[in-house]
Amino acid sequence: MQFIDQANIILKAGKGGNGIVSFRREKFVPAGGPSGGNGGKGGSIILVADNNLQTLLDFKFNREIFAKDGFKGGPNKRSGASGENTILKVPCGTEVRDVHTGIILGDLTIDKQSLTIAHGGRGGHGNAYYLSNQNRAPESFTEGQEGEIWEVQLELKLLAEVGIIGLPNAGKSTLISVLSSARPKIANYPFTTLIPNLGVVRKADGNGCLFADIPGLISGAAEGVGLGHDFLRHIQRTKILIHVIDSIAENPIHDFEIIEKELKQYGNGLLEKERIIVLNKKELIDENYLKIIIKKLENLSKKKVLVISSALREGLPSLLSEVWNRI
């Protein structure tokens, strides 16, 4: 399934039904009064969060969405039926923003949470509504109101508790695959991962914690280089970031600094999040050189640096213990 995490859509609620002009016509009632009923309310458009959805793909080719109009009133003061509401299911973690003002209209983070965006128009009044002592046979009626029109941006921000970040080819996908049941595409070249991969990691008590492998960030990601903004938004809701560094890269220290710079420039509190620094691929590097890198990273980050091998599954219990202690 294609992963779509942003969509702009136009929502048009239903028009209210018109009121009607009608008079009571019954045998033995030669001068029946007004009996025109009111129109029904137009349908509204309601967004509902659904835990079973992981993408906004449904909105890729369905950019204009309508609700049903209300029905006109009937004789004998019968009100018209309301128009049917349109229910749009979106993934949990979907933020809804007004395209024109940038104002956030809602944030759907809980399964079955709902948000009415476009409200249906009110039904018009039939002539029975206008009966008065001064006018015993009114012939006035009103049309139903137009429904609201909204142009909104849907933006999916994953609800993972732990985000795994780092430059391309640092070993993030291998890490999430050995920690969880996730099966991302893995290969020895940059940008193997083009969409976030999610995996549930089980604690000792059996409870699950959602991890997200965020596609490799690059220098300039905060300004949108590559797919930077698309990737960075998905770590905004995480509680902890695991920063994976390739220990056999040409310059692991510089790689660390690149990601730190991008987190700072993107803002939104990313740099203030709890972070665990991890050196990966320990099995491929000289032990003495590894110690030098660890010391430099710890001096630079002011944090303890963990050393692991995702491929050999070494150091993972210590990493998970650190994660559980911080959540």
Swiss-Prot record:
Record-annotated OBG-type G domain positions: 160-327
Obg domain location: 1-159
Cofactor or coenzyme needed: Mg(2+)
Pfam families noted in UniProt: GTP1_OBG, MMR_HSR1
Primary location: cytoplasm
An annotated Gene Ontology molecular function: ATP binding
Subcellular location: Cytoplasm
UniProt keyword annotation of Hydrolase present: yes
Gene Ontology process terms (BP): ribosome biogenesis
One cellular-component annotation, GO: cytoplasm
InterPro entries in UniProt: G_OBG (IPR031167), GTP-bd (IPR006073), GTP-bd_Obg/CgtA (IPR014100), GTP1_OBG_dom (IPR006169), GTP1_OBG_dom_sf (IPR036726), OBG_GTPase (IPR045086), P-loop_NTPase (IPR027417)
Keyword set, alphabetical order: ATP-binding, Cytoplasm, GTP-binding, Hydrolase, Magnesium, Metal-binding, Nucleotide-binding
Subunit-structure text: Monomer.
Function: An essential GTPase which binds GTP, GDP and possibly (p)ppGpp with moderate affinity, with high nucleotide exchange rates and a fairly low GTP hydrolysis rate. Plays a role in control of the cell cycle, stress response, ribosome biogenesis and in those bacteria that undergo differentiation, in morphogenesis control.
Family: Belongs to the TRAFAC class OBG-HflX-like GTPase superfamily. OBG GTPase family.
Protein name: GTPase Obg
Origin species: Prochlorococcus marinus (strain MIT 9515)
